[in-house]
C-alpha cells in the first residue's frame, strides 16, 4: 500500500491505473473515480480536511493507498 502525504490547503492529486475495471474510493473526502480496465483515473481534490484517509477498491475494500493531509 502506498503512503502519500499532502499539505492542507493544497491539492490531493493521485493517479490510479489498473489492469481490471474498478471503482476507487477516497474515504474522508467521499469521492470516487471509475478506473477502466487497462486505463487510469485521476483524483484531484482540495486538501481541506486534515487526517489520515484510506483509498481503496470499493467493491472489495482492498486498500491501495493511505493519504495523509498534514498542516500546511
Q: Which residues are covered by each model-predicted region?
A:
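Short proline/glycine-enriched turn/loop motifs at strand-loop junctions of beta-rich domains
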Residues: 16-22
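Extracellular/periplasmic metallocenter environments
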Residues: 35-72
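Surface-exposed loop/turn positions
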Residues: 8-10, 20, 39, 51
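Short linear motifs in intrinsically disordered
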Residues: 11-15, 42-45
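Beta-strand-rich interaction surfaces with strong enrichment in secreted/lumenal proteins
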Residues: 2-4, 30-34
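N-terminal edge beta-strand
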Residues: 1-11
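Short, surface-exposed beta-strand/strand-loop-strand elements in extracellular ectodomains
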Residues: 23-30
Amino acid at each position: 500500500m502506498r503512503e502519500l502525504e499532502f499539505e492542507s490547503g493544497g491539492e490531493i492529486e493521485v493517479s490510479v491505473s489498473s489492469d481490471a475495471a474498478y471503482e476507487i474510493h477516497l474515504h474522508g473526502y467521499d469521492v470516487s473515480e471509475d478506473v477502466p480496465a487497462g486505463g487510469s483515473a485521476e483524483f484531484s481534490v482540495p486538501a481541506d480536511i486534515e487526517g489520515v484517509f484510506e483509498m481503496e477498491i470499493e467493491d472489495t475494500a482492498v486498500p491501495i493507498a493511505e493519504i495523509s493531509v498534514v498542516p500546511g
